[in-house]
Amino acid sequence: MGQINRKFSEKQFLLFVVNYIAGFGFIATAISLFRLGPFSWLIFLLVSLVSLIVTLSFARLSSIDSQNYGGPYLWAKKAVDKEKIAGRMFSFFTGWNNFIIGPLSAATAPLFILNSFSGIDGIRGNLVNTWILIAIGFSFYVLLAFISTKGTSLNKKLIALFASVKWIVILSALIVAIYVIARDGNGYSQNNNLESGFFGRREISFAQIATVFITFFYSYAGVEDISVMTPDVKTNNFRKILIVSFIAVFLFYFIGIIILNGLQNIAQRGGEANSIGNVADIFKKAAGLGTLIFYGVGALFNNVSTRLSTIIANSRKILPLAYDNYLPSFFYKQNKKGEFQNAIWFTFGTTLIAMTLLVFIPLVASNFDFDNATEYAASVGSAATLLQYIFVFFIIFKFIYKKEPLYQKKWVKTTEELLFCLGTIVIVLMLLVYLFPVIDGFSKWETKHTLTIVLYGVLSLIGLVLFLLQEYKHKNKQNANKQTTQTTV
C-alpha cells in the first residue's frame, strides 16, 4: 500500500465533524421534541445519552484499523468468520444497510425546503398552489440528484462559503427566537406544565415517544460517515476527536433547546397566526414574509451544496461490497473518465424511487401537513441509521468476546460494556415501537407505517437477491475449479 495522504489536522477535522453533524438536522427536528411537552427534556437527554454511547463505540472501534477506509463494514469483516455464510451475510448487510441509509434519507431535504416555503400566504390552504410548490421543489431536487451523477465537486472555498451560510441561518433562527420571546413573552411555564396548558390535555403514547426519539436522533446522525475517514486525519487519537465533537454538538443543542422551549405555542400545528409548527414559523412570526424568505433561501442555498455530492458519495459505499464479491463486479467498473458510472446510476435510481415515495405518499396521506411529512421523512432515515448502530454494537461485542486488545483498563471495559448494552436495549425498544406502534395498545396503524416497512424491506430484499446471486456464482465457480482439478489429476 502506498503512503496515505492525510488531508486533515486534528483541529481541522474536529471542526469538520462538528460542522458535519450539527446543522439543519437539528432545526428540522427540534420542534418535534416539544410535541411531548415537559417530557421533551427527558427525550432530549435520552437521545443525547444514546448518541454518546454510539460515539464511544465508534471511537473504540476506530483503533481497529486506522490505515484503511471502510468503517463499520471493515470492522464487520474483521469480527466475523468469512468462511461461514452467516458471517458473510452479516458483513454484507452491515455495508448494505449503510448504503440504503442514503436513499431512505433522500426525502428529508426537499420536504424541509418545501416546508420552509409552505407558510407563504397563498400557498398554505390553496391546493393548486401547494401542488405547484411541490412540483417545482421536487423537480429541482431530482435535477440536483441528476447533476450530482456527473461528478460535480466543490472546492474548499465553496464548502466554507456554504458552511458559513448554514451557520448564519441556524444562529439567526435562535436570535429570532429570542426576539420573539422578548416581544411576545416567554412560554416556559406553558410548555413545561403537566397539569395545564396544551400538554395537560394531551394523551402521550409510547409510540409517540418512540417516534419523537427516532425523529430527533436524525440531528445526531453522521458519526457512521465520519468513522470511515480515519486514514484522512493526522492524529493518533481519533477517539478524542469524536468525543470532543460530541460534547460541542451537545452543548449547542442544549442551548438551542433552552431557547426554543421559551416560545409560546410551540409544536402547535394548524397554520394559525400564533402557532409554531416548524422553524420557518418562527421567522414568519418575527417579521412576516421577508424573514421567512430569508430563512427559506438561506436553507436552500446550503442544501444545494450537500445535494450536489450526495449521489457520488453514497455510491462509494457499495464499491467495497463489489470488490469483495458480495455484489456483482458490474458496480466497480469504471468509464473512460475513471468514474464508477454503474454504481452512480444504481444509487441515483434507488434514491429517486425512495425520494418519490417518501415525498408524495406522506404528504397526500396527511392532507399536506408539511411538518408531519418532514418529521416522518427524517425518522425513516434515522431508523435505518439506528439499525446500523445495532450492527456496530454487535461488532464490538464480538471483538470483546474474541479478546481483541481494545482496552487497557478493566474498569473502562466494564463501564463501556454496560453502556453498550444499555444503548442496544434502548435502540431496539424504540425501533420496535416505532415500526409497530400498535404494540403500545393505544396507537393506530397508518399508511406511513406500512410505507416504512415495505420500502426498507424492498431495499433490503434487493441487496439480499444480489448477495445470493453472487454466492451462487462463487459456489459454481468453486465446483467448476474442483472438477477441473480432479480431471487434470
UniProtKB/Swiss-Prot annotation:
| UniProt source species | Mycoplasma genitalium (strain ATCC 33530 / DSM 19775 / NCTC 10195 / G37) (Mycoplasmoides genitalium)
Family annotation (InterPro entries): AA/rel_permease1, APC_superfamily
What is the protein's name according to its record? Uncharacterized protein MG225
Q: GO molecular function: any one? A: transmembrane transporter activity
Q: Where are the transmembrane segments?
A: 14-34, 36-56, 100-120, 127-147, 158-178, 203-223, 241-261, 286-306, 344-364, 380-400, 419-439, 449-469
**Family the entry assigns:** To M.genitalium MG226.
Q: Name one Pfam family in it.
A: AA_permease_2
The answer to whether UniProt assigns keyword Transmembrane helix to this entry is: yes
The Gene Ontology CC terms held by the record are:
plasma membrane
User: Which topology term describes how it sits in the membrane?
Assistant: Multi-pass membrane protein
Per UniProt, subcellular location reads as: Cell membrane
Sorted alphabetically, which keywords does the UniProt record give?
Cell membrane, Membrane, Transmembrane, Transmembrane helix
